[in-house]
Regions:
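Gram-negative bacterial Sec-dependent N-terminal signal peptides
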Residues: 1-33
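Bacterial Sec-dependent N-terminal signal peptides
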Residues: 2, 27-53, 280, 285-286
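Conserved SGNH/GDSL esterase-like catalytic core that processes O-acyl groups on lipids
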Residues: 69-152, 286-289, 293
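Outer membrane beta-barrel transmembrane domains
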Residues: 106-108, 399-403, 491-604
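Outer membrane beta-barrel translocator domains of Type V secretion systems
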Residues: 120, 296-463, 557, 581-601
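Active-site segments of SGNH/GDSL-like serine hydrolases
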Residues: 132, 160-196, 215-219, 225
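Solvent-exposed, glycine/polar-rich loop segments of beta-barrel outer-membrane systems
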Residues: 185-192, 227-241, 344, 385-393, ...
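Mobile gating loops/cap/lid regions near enzyme active sites that modulate substrate access
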Residues: 185-192, 205, 212-258
């Protein structure tokens, strides 16, 4: 009954607690790893276990919201699978928030495996598969059938992966011992024994196959919660959304925040590197737990802030392209906006270009932000369509933008300073007069915009209201303008200024599985843009036939009021291929502004 004593006294010796939790595992292996010689690391490129030498071919993950990108991304939260994928050539993340191992819903382990099968993405040499379930099988109230359905679903799923080659040759499978769910703020302490039962089962699955390794998050997170300062945290008990990006463990009552996700990623990386030799040879149980605790005592997993993650390096972002899962990134492409003058000329034209950015710090809340520069280009033209047309125009705008994006809790603040260079070309033709003219004009704009977003995350939906304020200073350069029917006119340089405010809300629904590995992603947006100030435009001009006469004209510029509705849908195929369609309309001028756009994103 020693185990029961430890269950009631969870604040006792950690090593003793972890050994008590896993003591039943040590002798249950049908093919014990500790009877075999040390296994070389199949992911090593040079025979060592150094992090720089590890290269996985494809990382596949199955699980729940702890792994699902649709949960972490809207919250600007680190995702452990993305972090670990820095060691791989690619990531296939099939996890879905709320999923169970038990085959009881459309998002369970079996469904995720079906989604994988429909992609025709076969397991090949040096692939790593990670299975991470259990929290939702316990739930808030505990299991009602002693995990009978969960065990069956988990076993069937693992067997399907084994049959697919997940443990053949140089391939490996990681199964994950969950953190102590009962120490999560929103869960009762009474569920501790069920966590122990579940982890014992998962460990037995690992011990049944020499190429399946149990990754012990239970032991690590108990150490984190008992002494958070060792892991760069000040609190591992309470919820604080803002500080979960910096020094608190929990984002909400059920989930760790970015720092917790970073710890999970670090544990997986440890098993792939420094911990490989013992993890691949020892059964999940007392010996493996002792070895993991020894690594923790030797500070091999503590210095998280000293290890740069993928989010801290330089990043090249292609704009107006989709992510691999078919969704556009709100943290990337939405922040780069053409100024309103250019928008009025381009209507529904979208900027294309690239951005290069980096995190301004290696730790703390600033490490979640991005500083960078974006280069974008817009173009639109109208052509002569029949004999009644007299003019065609072409408009180009090239922009260089310095930007800063900073998440804080569910807020995302972005600011950008842009220099836009515009070029206008107008061609005129009159066949009857046998006369044609070409006029080239240029202008530039300095634009400063600030935007604040806040994301409300619900089951299956992310709702993001936002507000913006911008100022633009425009300069229209002087030039000679030719006309088909009057004398040429020399225009002088002209300057003006605009101030705009914007309000809007964006909706993004969680991916919907539509069969054969495809996902349907649906989004919508409603925004209102209004000019707070538009200065009048004063034009100075001189006709060529009257060179000594300077004339001027002041043009009052009407206020801008636009309320735009946009709808978009993307079908994400496997291997990053996606197809999308969008519809946009200005509700104040619907008959004049309807626009439909169809896109395809095919990586090569």
């Amino acid at each position: 009954m020693e185990d029961q004593a430890f269950i009631r006294n969870k604040s006792g010796s950690l090593t003793a607690v972890c050994c008590a939790v896993l003591v039943l595992i040590a002798g249950c292996s049908s093919s014990p790893k500790n009877s075999e010689p040390a296994s070389s690391n199949p992911f090593s490129t040079n025979g060592t276990n150094n992090a720089s030498a590890i290269k996985i071919n494809k990382l596949r993950t199955f699980g729940d919201s702890y792994t699902d990108l649709a949960y972490t991304s809207p919250r600007a939260m680190t995702n452990w699978a993305v972090e670990v994928s820095s060691m791989a050539n690619g990531l296939e993340n099939y996890a879905i928030g709320g999923a169970k191992a038990a085959s009881t819903s459309s998002i369970d382990f079996a469904t995720q495996l079906n989604n994988w099968n429909t992609t025709n993405s076969a397991i090949t040499d040096k692939d790593l598969t990670v299975v991470y379930f259990g929290y939702n099988d316990i739930g808030r109230g505990g299991t009602s059938d002693n995990f009978a359905a969960a065990r069956a679903g988990y076993t069937d799923g693992v067997n399907r992966l084994i049959a697919g080659g997940a443990t053949n040759g140089n391939n490996r499978m990681f199964v994950t011992l969950i953190t102590d769910w009962s120490r999560t703020p929103g869960i009762s302490d009474s569920l501790h024994s069920q966590v122990v039962t579940w982890n014992n089962f998962v460990a037995s699955v690992a011990n049944s196959n020499p190429n399946i390794i149990a990754v012990d998050l239970y032991t690590v997170f108990n150490r984190v919660q008992d002494k958070p300062s060792d892991f760069g945290l000040v609190n591992a008990t309470d919820v604080d959304k803002e500080r979960s990006y910096t020094d608190y463990l929990f984002f909400d009552t059920l989930h760790p925040g970015s720092k917790g996700q970073e710890i999970i990623a670090r544990v997986f990386k440890h098993y792939l590197t420094r911990g490989w030799n013992w993890a691949s040879t020892l059964d999940a149980g007392t010996s493996a737990t002792n070895q993991l605790n020894q690594d923790l005592d030797n500070n091999l997993l503590k210095a998280f802030n000293q290890t740069a993650t993928t989010s801290q390096g330089l990043r090249l972002v292609p704009l107006t392209t989709s992510n691999t899962d078919g969704r556009r990134s709100g943290r990337d492409s939405r922040v780069f906006n053409l100024n309103q003058t250019a928008r009025n000329n381009l209507e529904e034209s979208v900027a294309n270009g690239v951005a290069l950015d980096f995190a301004p710090a290696n730790s703390g809340i600033w490490s979640q932000g991005r500083l960078g520069v974006a280069l974008t280009q817009n173009a639109q033209s109208t052509r002569l369509t029949d004999i009644e047309d007299r003019y065609s125009t072409r408009f180009n705008s090239n922009a260089t933008t310095l930007y800063w994006m900073q998440p804080y809790n569910n807020f995302l603040f972005s600011t950008q300073l842009s220099r836009l260079d515009h070029a206008f070309t107008q061609n005129g033709l009159d066949d009857l007069l046998n006369r044609s003219v070409t006029n080239d004009r240029s202008a530039h704009t300095w634009s400063l915009e600030g935007k604040l977003r806040y994301t409300y995350a619900f089951d299956g939906l992310a709702l993001t209201p936002w507000a913006s304020l911008s100022q633009q200073n425009h300069t229209l350069n002087g030039g000679l303008i030719q006309s088909l029917y009057t004398s040429d006119v020399q225009f002088s340089q002209t300057k003006t200024r605009d101030i705009y405010s914007g309000l809007g809300v964006d909706l993004q629904f969680s991916p919907i599985a539509i069969g054969q590995g495809r996902k349907l992603l649906i989004g919508a947006g409603l925004n209102h843009l209004q000019s707070l100030r538009r200065e009048a435009l004063t034009l100075g001009m001189t006709e060529q036939i009257n060179p000594g006469v300077q004339m001027s004209e002041t043009i009052d510029r009407s206020r801008v009021r636009k309320t735009q509705l946009s709808l978009n849908a993307v079908v994400a195929e496997h291997k990053g291929i996606s197809y999308g369609a969008s519809y946009a309309v200005d509700l104040q001028k619907p008959s004049e502004t309807k626009a439909v756009r169809v896109t395809a994103n095919i990586p090569f």
